Amino acid sequence: MASFFLSSLVLFLAALILVPQGLAQYHLNPVYEPPVNGPPVNKPPQKETPVHKPPQKETPVHKPPQKEPPRHKPPQKEPPRHKPPHKKSHLHVTKPSYGKHPTEEHNIHF
């Protein structure tokens, strides 16, 4: 009988330690605790007003014009061209145009 009493006492003490609220507040009505945070309020999203920023212009940098250095190119020698001498004929006869009578200067049929 002593072992039963001892085991029930250990069980009762273990229940008191393990249950965080304990048995004293079991029969009491729950106490109202207000919420830490307020109720959610539906607010329309606030749009930030656009800030007008003028475009930033880069300051012009003055660079003096740079001339390219002269390039040395060797002179190109063209091979000599051998053309036969052009012989002009003494009688230069031109053909009359089609459908026209030859003028007296070009008429060689006297």
Swiss-Prot record:
Residues 45-81, 101-110 have a biased composition (Basic and acidic residues). This is Early nodulin-12A. Residues 1-24 form the signal peptide. Disulfide bonds: none annotated. Residues 34-88 are annotated as: 11 X 5 AA approximate tandem repeats of P-P-[VQRH]-[NKH]-[GKE]. It is found in: Secreted, Cell wall. The keyword Kinase does not apply. Sequence repeats lie at residues 34-38, 39-43, 44-48, 49-53, 54-58, 59-63, 64-68, 69-73, 74-78, 79-83, 84-88. Induction: By soluble compounds from rhizobium (in cells through which the infection thread is migrating and also in cells that do not yet contain an infection thread). The gene is ENOD12A. Belongs to the plant proline-rich protein superfamily. ENOD12 family. Involved in the infection process during the plant-rhizobium interaction. It comes from Pisum sativum (Garden pea). Residues 82-93 have a biased composition (Basic residues). The keyword Secreted applies. Residues 32-43 have a biased composition (Pro residues). GO terms for cellular component: extracellular region. PANTHER family: PROLINE-RICH EXTENSIN-LIKE PROTEIN EPR1, REPETITIVE PROLINE-RICH CELL WALL PROTEIN 3. Residues 31-110 are annotated as: Disordered. Its main location: secreted. Root nodules, stem and flower. InterPro entries: Proline-rich_CW_protein. Keywords: Cell wall, Nodulation, Repeat, Secreted, Signal.
